């Protein structure tokens, strides 16, 4: 029997991936990793330094300068830490969304975070939600869900 298992939830923005993942994680008492929050943290780092989030020549060096960590509270809530500071609120600001979207398209960022996300899944049972989770990040996940929702729902 495997020591750890992984669940991957893919789907478009606004489909309810995080809502479902949080509920399942709570029910199964496993870790929920919101991968979008990790990208938002890099976007926030770029924003706060005045960098062009579309310019890989600016973002690649940033990845070597910053320290990104995750902490989880007693309820399993994910906190994002940037250089030791909790930035969980800041990364949800509307102006950070575009930065997060832009940095997430950069190959250097995707490669940087890919290993981080896979390492988490190697060490613990997890449910991860985000785009490309079941195809790229956790292609061998024990359970893969592609979640969609209509505009009416």
Locations of regions flagged by a protein language model:
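Hydrophobic anchor at the beta1->P-loop junction of P-loop NTPases
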Residues: 7-9
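P-loop (Walker A) phosphate-binding loop of NTP-binding proteins
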Residues: 12
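Conserved glycine(s) of the Walker
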Residues: 16
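Hydrophobic positions on the alpha1 helix immediately C-terminal to the Walker A/P-loop
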Residues: 20
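Post-Walker A helix-loop "phosphate-sensing" segment adjacent to the P-loop in P-loop NTPases
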Residues: 25-34, 48-52
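Conserved phosphate-donor/acceptor-positioning beta-strand/loop module used by diverse small-molecule
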Residues: 139-153
């Amino acid at each position: 029997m495997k020591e750890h298992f992984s669940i991957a939830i893919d789907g478009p923005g606004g489909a309810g991936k995080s809502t479902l993942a949080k509920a399942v994680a709570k029910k199964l008492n496993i870790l929920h990793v919101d991968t979008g929050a990790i990208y938002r943290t890099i976007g926030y780092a770029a924003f706060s330094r005045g960098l062009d989030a579309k310019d890989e020549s600016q973002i690649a060096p940033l990845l070597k300068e910053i320290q990104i960590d995750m902490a989880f509270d007693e309820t399993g809530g994910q906190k994002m830490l940037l250089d030791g500071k909790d930035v969980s609120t800041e990364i949800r600001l509307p102006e950070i969304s575009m930065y997060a979207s832009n940095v997430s398209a950069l190959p250097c960022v995707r490669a940087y975070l890919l290993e981080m996300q896979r390492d988490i899944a190697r060490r613990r049972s997890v449910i991860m939600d985000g785009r490309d989770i079941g195809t790229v990040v956790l292609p061998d996940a024990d359970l893969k869900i592609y979640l969609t929702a209509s505009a009416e729902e």
